[in-house]
Amino acid sequence: MPYTKKKPIIIVDGSLYLYRSYFTFQNFNSNEENPSGAIYGMLKTIQNILNKNYNSKKIIIIFDSSKKNFRNTIFKEYKSNRSAMPNKLYVQIQPLFKILEEIGIKTLSILGIEADDIIGSLAYKLEQKGEQVLIVSHDKDMIQLITDNINVLNISKNSILTPEKIQEKYGIYPKEFIDLLALMGDSSDNIPGVPKIGIKTALFLLKKFSNIKNIYNNIEKIQSLPFRNAKNAAIQLKNYKKTAFLSYQLAKIKLDVPINITSEEITLKKTCFKKLSNLIRWYSFNE
């Protein structure tokens, strides 16, 4: 069971786990008027997070807002491949927020700001204050935020991602993951990337040139490099330069969103664990 020796502040990717909870417990409650599977799933997820990180006393859960953000402005197709939120999930959101408030767990969403940007900005701000941060998410976008003081917990795989683990797996630094997504694209967010540039080619180029800016500064050298289809890759990069840099803007998580959260707001009260357990038990009995 992974846990960190210090006491990190936990930032949960609430939108991600809200959807996951909804689909996992879609048939949890057959009551058409008051579905509760997403609520139950979120409470179980929070309990699991706190059990795995029992030495942490500060937690905040971040959610997307319904309003579009700057990425939709610069690229209208951003996330356009995603279906609208199911109504059975939508009706559980406000009740969930009220329940979390009763328990004493802080939530945050900001109109027109994507959850990823809130998470990144808050994590960066806390790191600047000397805090250790643990982001709970299995979204690959979060990899770019990883530092010695900001780690990412994937509760499904029971693993904590660190800079060393990212370098071991990909051979690049976490911050270069933005460039990786810019080159190869990201179908889940509908980020285009450069067509026909896959992960192997992208990683080869980043290991040699570090970032897309440096790749384009050395664009004439690429066709002669020792990797498969180097000539075709060079042509694709030249033809889709604007798309590559647009994709970089879409993939890069903002670190400068103004966030005013006090330490007291995110500190768990002693009654939190009991309230959480009681609610989970109540939902289990009333399923």
UniProtKB/Swiss-Prot annotation:
Q: Which SUPFAM superfamilies match?
A: 5' to 3' exonuclease, C-terminal subdomain, PIN domain-like
Q: Does the keyword Manganese apply?
A: no
- Residue intervals of the 5'-3' exonuclease domain: 172-270
Q: Name the EC number(s).
A: 3.1.11.-
* Annotated CDD domains: H3TH_53EXO, PIN_53EXO
Q: Which GO terms describe its molecular function?
A: 5'-3' exonuclease activity; 5'-flap endonuclease activity; DNA binding
Whichever gene encodes this chain, its name is: pol
**Top-level taxon:** Bacteria
The name this protein carries in UniProt is 5'-3' exonuclease
Could you provide one GO biological process annotation from this protein's UniProt record? DNA replication, Okazaki fragment processing
Listed A to Z, the keywords are: DNA-binding, Exonuclease, Hydrolase, Nuclease
Q: What does this protein do?
A: 5'-3' exonuclease acting preferentially on double-stranded DNA.
Q: Which organism is it from?
A: Buchnera aphidicola subsp. Schizaphis graminum (strain Sg)
- Give a yes or no for keyword DNA-binding in this entry: yes
Q: What class of enzyme is it?
A: hydrolase
